[in-house]
Amino acid sequence: VVTGSGNRHAILQDVQKVLNGEETKVVDIRPHQKGESFEELPMDRFADHTRAFVKVEDGCNRRCAYCVIPRARGPVRSRSEISILEELRRLAASGYCEVVLTAISLPSYGKDTGTGLAELVEHAAAVAGIERIRLGSLDPDMLTDDDIRRLAAVPKLCPQFHLSLQSGSSKTLRAMRRPYTTEQYAAVAAKLREAFGEENVSITTDVIVGFPGETEQDFEDSMAFVAGQRFLKVHVFPYSRREGTPAFDFPNQVPEHEKES
């Protein structure tokens, strides 16, 4: 039985059909539609008794060559700020003093509703009982100077940022269809360090190795760029082909043994 979360109400019936022999398999996944609203799935308890995770957005409007998320998750759908703040108040009342705002495309929050991430963080910081706010992964090209200025003015925001890189080679970034260069990435990272204070801020990132067409020189360029950025932590993982993405059919696929070496 394969079903989407939007059809979870029918999962017992679907399983029963298979058990009864009415069906050998059930695939019940409905595609996301443009204009679809954010699906509310609030949580009030977490394994960590002080830190809670609050999802504020789903979907992605980008078309990175390697990524299947837009196809699987649909377009950007922002959760209403009223709903988010209500959940934060419930969490604070339950003893959670730290929240992590998460999303599929966090900087896209509010792009479909006329608001924005910086505004949400400002309002979240005003919730009584919430003492620390952390952010999920951020795309460098979607952080404006005004966003950085406003975020730096929120004392409750922890200055630890996961700034997605994917490659330290501008050539590879173009092939990936990422909308920034390494120079632009470095400029945003520098602005974060300046705004929050070099001694206070920490930046982590992720890097894909073995993307189709990546040469030894591209790899060396990527390594050199990463080394120069003074990241607190780098999550490195090999490129994995995803059927239905443009990169799946790209020429010059890198052999698996090279990716792992």
What are these regions (language model features)?
Residues 249-261:
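Terminal RNA-binding accessory module
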Residues 3, 75-76, 112, 177, ...:
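Pocket-edge positions in alpha/beta enzyme catalytic cores
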Residues 173-176, 246-250:
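Short acidic, glycine/proline-rich loop/turn micro-motifs
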